[in-house]
Regions:
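Acidic, metal-coordinating helix/loop segments flanking the phosphotransfer/catalytic sites
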Residues: 38-57, 97
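Conserved phosphotransfer cores of two-component systems
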Residues: 50-53, 76-83, 95, 99
């Protein structure tokens, strides 16, 4: 796994309701040099985003409990904080390109670290 340039300067918010999957994603991104914040649902992620200004990438699952899913969260983030890059993931659905905000990327589950890191690089390039 290659470490992206400026990884240490990028804080990632991981939003995943499956504890084991979230822990693995945290480990994967920390191993790649990213600083990571985690949330178990979109509502928790929204509260974190409102209280912090250092999030550079949102890495979110689509299906999760709470008042909004990952698509709704990503759309709200793209509207309110357009500088935050979006990487969306799911093992159950494959969104149409129009469902992913303009500067967002989709990575299907199960994913490998290199797939996620490439998506981060592409999202950051937009």
């Amino acid at each position: 796994m290659s470490i992206p340039p400026n990884a240490s300067a990028t804080r990632v918010l991981i939003v995943e309701d499956e504890d084991l999957v979230r822990m693995m994603a945290v480990d994967m991104l920390e191993d790649a040099g990213f600083a990571v914040v985690e949330a178990a649902c979109a509502d928790e992620a929204w509260a974190i985003l409102q209280s912090r200004s250092d999030i550079g990438v949102l890495f979110t699952d689509i299906e999760m409990p709470g008042s909004m899913n990952g698509f709704v969260l990503a759309a709200r983030v793209a509207e309110r904080w357009p500088q935050i890059r979006l990487v969306i993931t799911s093992g159950r659905c494959r969104p149409a390109p129009r469902d992913v905000p303009d500067h967002g990327m989709f990575v299907p589950k199960p994913y490998l670290a290199d797939q996620v890191l490439r998506a981060f690089e592409r999202a950051r390039a937009h």
